[in-house]
């Protein structure tokens, strides 16, 4: 087990050296930005940023590949585009209209085994739309998915 911890620390250190530093963002009322005026975000911008659309999300690899629970991956999550956001009315929800597969190279290993590179495919959401919630409920009954024909 100490070997795995050492290897994980090594990967984190290596990642920190390779990736550029991300600048921190200041909030409107942070101590470094004291002002009596508060910027108001216009409605159109608020609407466009909150409406149903694909947004970058960090997704755990094991949640996409539950059969791989006995393995460790580096990184343990990947960045994918996923549908999220609000719809024009409460009876609707945001769902993918179009998806595409993306293949990523990851490092895979078991506790004492030598790590190796693998290529894994993930589904990304390309286009999203708002659909009625009743369509979602119609497809599931008592937690079991009904197959679509």
Curated annotation (Swiss-Prot):
GO cellular component: extracellular space; membrane
Glycan attachment positions: 33, 101
Gene Ontology MF terms: chemoattractant activity; growth factor activity; vascular endothelial growth factor receptor binding
Alphabetical list of Pfam families matching this protein: PDGF
Keyword Cell inner membrane found: no
SMART domains: PDGF
Localization, UniProt: Secreted
Signal sequence, start to end: 1-18
SUPFAM superfamilies documented for this protein: Cystine-knot cytokines
GO biological process, one term: cell differentiation
Keyword DNA repair set for record: no
Disulfide bond sites: 52-94, 83-128, 87-130
Function: Growth factor active in angiogenesis and endothelial cell growth, stimulating their proliferation and migration. It binds to the receptor FLT1/VEGFR-1. Also promotes cell tumor growth.
Assembly and oligomerization: Antiparallel homodimer; disulfide-linked. Also found as heterodimer with VEGFA/VEGF.
Family under the similarity heading: Belongs to the PDGF/VEGF growth factor family.
Protein name per the record: Placenta growth factor
The organism of origin for this protein: Bos taurus
């Amino acid at each position: 087990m100490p070997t795995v911890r050492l290897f994980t620390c090594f990967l984190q250190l290596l990642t920190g050296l390779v990736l550029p530093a991300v600048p921190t963002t200041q909030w409107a009322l942070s101590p470094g930005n004291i002002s009596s005026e508060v910027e108001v975000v216009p409605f159109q911008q608020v609407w466009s940023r909150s409406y149903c659309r694909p947004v970058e999300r960090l997704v755990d690899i094991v949640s996409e590949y539950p059969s791989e629970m006995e393995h460790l991956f580096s990184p343990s999550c990947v960045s994918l585009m996923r549908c999220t956001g609000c719809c024009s009315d409460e009876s609707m929800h945001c769902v993918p209209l179009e998806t595409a597969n993306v293949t990523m190279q990851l490092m895979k290993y078991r506790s004492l085994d030598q790590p190796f590179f693998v290529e894994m495919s993930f589904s990304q959401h390309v286009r999203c739309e708002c659909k009625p919630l009743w369509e979602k409920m119609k497809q599931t009954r008592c937690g079991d998915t009904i197959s679509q024909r």
